[in-house]
């Protein structure tokens, strides 16, 4: 069975720290210890951290995307650890931080401008949740002409009514790979 991309003759992409921007989506406490706890957090979180270290070592562009909810919201509650970026991923000077209020990281943010200034054509997406923010960002990125790559072992999701997290991730990533981007392992990005 062939993907939509392959039927169009679009070859799979590769990524390196030299030719791409790392975009870390919603790596926040809500997904580690909140109501939206990710089922594979123990596996995906270290892979995000490892990629971040590769990009930092290469002095490559990095964007941290954080989801913000209204004051008093029960998810990503402002002023609590649930809203904070994971400690090991804390942005360093020179790393962009984009605050979003919608599932897609491009919607009503300056992400497009930041990426354009990087001079790169590829974006490597990692983070949470595969079926919502990662998928929406991949789709928005592809629509804007970015070569989208998802590090499939550096994303995760939670169980939702009717679908367990592993199946949800599998389907979300298959949809991205069919039309919007390329899936790679984090270890294949150097």
UniProtKB/Swiss-Prot annotation:
Residues forming the catalytic site: 26, 100, 133
EC class: hydrolase
GO cellular component entries: extracellular region; host cell cytoplasm; host cell nucleus
Expression induction: Expression is up-regulated during the infection stages.
Assigned keywords, A-Z: Host cytoplasm, Host nucleus, Hydrolase, Secreted, Virulence
An example Gene Ontology biological process: effector-mediated suppression of host innate immune response
Record localization: Secreted; Host cytoplasm; Host nucleus
Any Pfam family: Isochorismatase
Gene Ontology MF terms in the entry: isochorismatase activity
Catalytic activity: isochorismate + H2O = (2S,3S)-2,3-dihydroxy-2,3-dihydrobenzoate + pyruvate
Enzyme Commission code: 3.3.2.1
Deleted gene: phenotype: Leads to a significant reduction in virulence and increased the concentrations of both free salicylate and its glucoside (SAG) by 100-150% in inoculated cotton plants.
InterPro entries hit by this protein: Isochorismatase-like_dom, Isochorismatase-like_hydrls, Isochorismatase-like_sf
Keyword Nucleotidyltransferase: no
Family, similarity comment: Belongs to the isochorismatase family.
Known function: Secreted isochorismatase required for full virulence of V.dahliae. Suppresses salicylate-mediated innate immunity of the host by disrupting the plant salicylate metabolism pathway via hydrolysis of its isochorismate precursor.
Entry protein name: Secreted isochorismatase effector Isc1
Provenance organism: Verticillium dahliae (strain VdLs.17 / ATCC MYA-4575 / FGSC 10137) (Verticillium wilt)
Organism classification: Eukaryota, Fungi, Dikarya, Ascomycota, Pezizomycotina
């Amino acid at each position: 069975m062939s993907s939509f991309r392959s039927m169009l003759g679009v070859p799979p992409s590769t990524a390196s720290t030299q030719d791409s921007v790392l975009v870390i989506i919603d790596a926040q406490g809500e997904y580690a210890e909140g109501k939206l706890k990710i089922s594979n957090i123990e596996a995906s979180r270290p892979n995000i951290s490892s990629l971040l270290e590769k990009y930092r070592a290469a002095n490559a562009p990095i964007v941290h995307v954080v989801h913000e909810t209204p004051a008093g919201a029960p998810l990503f509650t402002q002023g609590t650890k649930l809203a904070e970026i994971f400690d090991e991923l804390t942005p360093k000077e020179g790393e962009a931080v984009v605050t979003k209020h919608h599932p897609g990281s491009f919607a009503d943010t300056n992400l497009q401008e930041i990426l354009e200034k990087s001079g790169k054509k590829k974006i490597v997406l990692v983070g949470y949740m595969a079926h919502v923010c990662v998928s929406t960002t991949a789709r928005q990125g592809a629509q804007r002409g970015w070569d989208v790559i998802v590090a499939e072992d550096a994303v995760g999701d939670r169980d939702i009514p009717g679908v367990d997290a592993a199946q949800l991730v599998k389907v979300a990533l298959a949809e991205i790979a069919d039309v919007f981007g390329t899936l790679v392992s984090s270890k294949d990005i150097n």
